[in-house]
Structure formats: C-alpha cells, structure tokens
Amino acid sequence: AIPDLTYEQFIQTYQKYYHPSNAFVFLDGDVPLDDVLELLNQEYLSSMEANLPIEGPIYQQPVQVSRQVVDYEIGEEENAENKYRMAWGNVIGSYQDYEKVIAMQVLSDVLCGDNQAVLNKVLLEKGLAENVYLAINDGELQNWCQLEVDHIKEENLDQVKEIVFDTLQTLIKKGIDRQQLEATLAYLELNLKERNFGGYPQGIIFGFQVLESWLYGGKPEAHLEYGKIFDDLKKNP
C-alpha cells in the first residue's frame, strides 16, 4: 500500500517497470520513418537489455452477482433525502469486441442520451430520479458498462429498480425503433469520422486508441479501423 511504500521499494519498482521492456512506442505524422527508427535504436533502445518477462493478460472470471450498499459524502448544507443512487454493472466483452462497444454506445444514447430517451423519460416523468446514464468503459482488457440512476428518495428505490428492469424487458421483447437506432448510429459515425477531439492533439488521441488493443496483444490499428464495423451495424442495427 502507498502509505507503507519505502523509497527503496519505489526505486525498485521504477527500475523494473519504467523500462523499454515494458514500453510501447508509436510515431505520428509525416516523419522520415527509417531515420527516426534508427535514431531511437541507436540512442535509446540498443543500449538496454530486456529485463521484464512478458506476461499474458489476466481476465476477471465471472463472479456471483451481489448487492452492495456503500455510503458516500455530501455537503453539510445538502439535503440527503433524495441523494440515493442505484447502479448496475456488467462486463461486455474484451478489447477485441470493438463492434460491441460501438453498439453499446448507440444503446446508451437511445436509453439515456437526453430527457426524451426511454429510461430518462419514464423516470423523470414520474419524478423518481433526476439523472440516468449508461457509461461504456472501453479501452481496457475487459470492457464494461454501468447503468446509474441518481437523486432517488429511499422509499422509491424498489420502484425505480422495477421500472428500470420492466422497461428493459419491454425493449427486449418489442425491440427499439429502427429509425431511432439508424439516426443514432449515423450521428456516432459522423463524430468518429470528423475526428473532433475537443482541442486535444490528434496524434495523442490516436496513440490512446492504438493502445486500447495493442496493450493486450491485439493489432495496433484495430481501434482505428471502424468503417466495416459501421457497415455491419447498419445492416443489422
């Protein structure tokens, strides 16, 4: 644990893991590739020996579903009456399931994207919650999602859970409006193709996307190539 970490342990950890053996190098832009690679090799990589064994990824095995109650802090002046939250999480595949990640991002927008989205609308109209969102956590060995509903009163917790699961079951049985799915899919595709990263350098974002697969043994370019994924999803949204 950090409070018990000694300086010697810190140095040992640094020397073991902050090493080219545990590094991923990527280049971005129109650079003289041969010259840059030669420079990296001569000035940096060739003088060091590999000292870190390559370990395969460790997957989280399925666990028994459990209910956990956790306290969290609020401000002294805040009213705790409607500060309850409910959340459900689930693994949705591995780093290789990029098509599933994009499909889940579409589903997140359909379910919780705005106040007229399916789950938002039913809970807001009944005054049972203030926020509903479905977070998709990708770029990891195992991607996962979390559906969260917040600003709930304690006496409404069971009702909120019932409405959430009933609504999802109805969608499973009746399906989601195809036009809505296609519109959301088109919007997401446009955003990705425009490569608008909100002011962040494009090369840095590309590097992060490369690592989302490369870190776990996948192809570096896997999460940069999504044209076919959208084509497949359009055929069967």
Region annotations inferred by a language model:
Residues 64-69:
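Intrinsically disordered, low-complexity regulatory segments
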Residues 1-58, 62, 79-87, 92-97, ...:
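Charge-rich, well-structured scaffold segments of protease-associated domains
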Residues 71-78:
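Edge strands and adjacent loops of beta-rich recognition modules
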